[in-house]
From Swiss-Prot:
<dbReference type="Pfam" id="PF00270">
    <property type="entry name" value="DEAD"/>
</dbReference>
<protein>
    <recommendedName>
        <fullName>Putative pre-mRNA-splicing factor ATP-dependent RNA helicase C20H4.09</fullName>
        <ecNumber>3.6.4.13</ecNumber>
    </recommendedName>
</protein>
<dbReference type="InterPro" id="IPR002464">
    <property type="entry name" value="DNA/RNA_helicase_DEAH_CS"/>
</dbReference>
<dbReference type="GO" id="GO:0045292">
    <property type="term" value="P:mRNA cis splicing, via spliceosome"/>
</dbReference>
<dbReference type="Pfam" id="PF07717">
    <property type="entry name" value="OB_NTP_bind"/>
</dbReference>
<keyword id="KW-0347">Helicase</keyword>
<dbReference type="GO" id="GO:0003724">
    <property type="term" value="F:RNA helicase activity"/>
</dbReference>
<dbReference type="InterPro" id="IPR014001">
    <property type="entry name" value="Helicase_ATP-bd"/>
</dbReference>
<dbReference type="GO" id="GO:0000398">
    <property type="term" value="P:mRNA splicing, via spliceosome"/>
</dbReference>
<keyword id="KW-0539">Nucleus</keyword>
<dbReference type="Pfam" id="PF04408">
    <property type="entry name" value="HA2_N"/>
</dbReference>
<dbReference type="InterPro" id="IPR007502">
    <property type="entry name" value="Helicase-assoc_dom"/>
</dbReference>
<dbReference type="GO" id="GO:0016887">
    <property type="term" value="F:ATP hydrolysis activity"/>
</dbReference>
<dbReference type="GO" id="GO:0003723">
    <property type="term" value="F:RNA binding"/>
</dbReference>
<dbReference type="InterPro" id="IPR048333">
    <property type="entry name" value="HA2_WH"/>
</dbReference>
<comment type="similarity">
    <text>Belongs to the DEAD box helicase family. DEAH subfamily.</text>
</comment>
<dbReference type="Pfam" id="PF21010">
    <property type="entry name" value="HA2_C"/>
</dbReference>
Amino acid sequence: MPNEFISQSLSTLTNTPLNIQKKLLPITKYRNQLLYAVEQNQITIVLGHTGCGKTTQIPQFLYEAGWASQNGIIGCTQPRRLVAKSVSERVSLELNSPPGSLCGYSIQFDHNVSEKTKIKYMTDGILLNEIFFDPLLERYSIVILDEVHERTLSTDLLLGVLKRILEKRNDFRLVLSSASVDANKLSQFFGQDKVCTMSIEGKLFPVETLFLQKPTENYVDSAIETVININSTYPPGDILVFLSGRKEIEYCIKKIEDSLIHASEDCQTLVPLPLHAGLTVDEQMRVFNIYDGDFRKVIFSTNIAETSITIDGIVYVVDSGFNKQRIYNPYTRTSKLINVPISKSSAIQRSGRAGRTMRGKVFRLYTEKAYSLMKEEFEADILNCDMSPLVLFLKGLGLKNILQFPFFVRPPTVHLMAALEDLYLLGVLDESGNLTDPLGIQISNSFLDANISKALLTSNQFGCTHEILSIASILTAGEVFYNPTSSSKNDAFVAHSSFFANEGDIITALNVFESFVGNKKDLQWCRKNYLNYQTLRQALDIRTHLVRFLNKFSIPTAQRLPSSDCSKILKCLLDGFVRNVAHLQNDGSYKTIGGKQVWLDSSSVLHEKKTPWIMYSSAVESETQIFVKNISKIESFWLDKYYKREK
């Protein structure tokens, strides 16, 4: 196939007028069938491959049919922030309306909606929060739960909540949209007499699937070799590489950047781009940038690119065959991320990314036998995570007996019991399992982790609300230090050490944040000191939201300590992280109050300091050990009142 023809094919969709693009989408010919199904049934399940137009067109069909004219607006949930924002902007373009006007979006810490908004894209967590203030979702005439197959904790919660709302609102409609969900299970859950299922048929371009003849010893290095081989051998077309996590992505990008130095002049110049949840939405949006013919995008992504988003120009997919799965241990209160083989459903979704605009190829870095042994579907998050957020949410809705909630899949009892115990010891639940007043009620209204929320809500008693606001924001935003893997690693350590505090990691992070604000939030200052500018900017945004949160309960937010004594800050944090304490053992490890052996994370400023007593914010389990993070030095006598309560 001539290169000129391929280049033209790649740009066809981009250069086609919007109205023609919409007509070319497979879902367009199902418009009337969809509207009739929604009119006649409370619940409509729409099955269709990624890219058929479900996410962008269904809300527009409903808007044009009058579903947002009188009784409420149209809501569309997404599991991921990137999708909610990017799709909203795309639909605004198609409607010839300014973003945030007729169509808007709402994601955590970022909202672009107005009184004129009739179509609202949002993360599933945002809709859950709205239920606190609008229990029957009376603002909405219809809600579309998109990508329901991803089975996040929020999605599963929404399924149960929406089932209850449907029982009380005959005028309410629900659309469940997915590329690969089991429609029969959903129909049985909601009641088959209420459900209509329709499939969107649409022909993808042919995709050639290539398997390995024998297993690879290192799929990450194999992915890099495959990318370089594609660039030197195959015609133009962008490349999408599926990996399991951030470290693998960063490793591959560095290797590709290094390879560009020795690349042949006959090849296109590769433009390596990351795509994972650790990036800001603006950073994620870079994958949609269009480059001229001398350049070839290679996107290294987690499963975020499996569904929901369609990146024009992808012709080649490299599938590692692995994904990260979080496993929660209710006995140790720790979680670990492990590499697991993907499901067959995910493998099919990944290969489909190559056939969007022209013929494609998928390079599966595993054998046909490995594929045959894969599970059909991935496990739901509700089976493998801490249940504290779920319990808080349901208690906030006034549910006395959690087991009466209509779970699509019931969480393990041991996970629920662990969450109930933790929330009781934190003072969020009373002995009857009800929210305490005011603390429990306030925490149930917070988007923060319950431990951080308690520290924040009690900070005025310690006179350090100003500092705890900043700390809560940093802990929520993520890692403030940028740790390069290059020759500048030592320079970064020297820069970071100027912020180190004897009290530990959290006061160190507070030093960074306050210095960032004191240096006028300057990007160049962050680069000079090897700090994550985007994380610090996000922490500022989170802090603004937290100030508003405290204002709702008339809690003063300007209180700050008059001196450099950090003990009150640490005592306040201990009020929230009372279970997360440990004392030093002879072998250098630590023993928690629950008797578990843990080790300090190597990145901690207290690593190898042999601090007698510590407090930590989180624990991560490896194959053989438990590591604690965000560590602070505490005094043993601070624990007296808490130990008395536990006994």
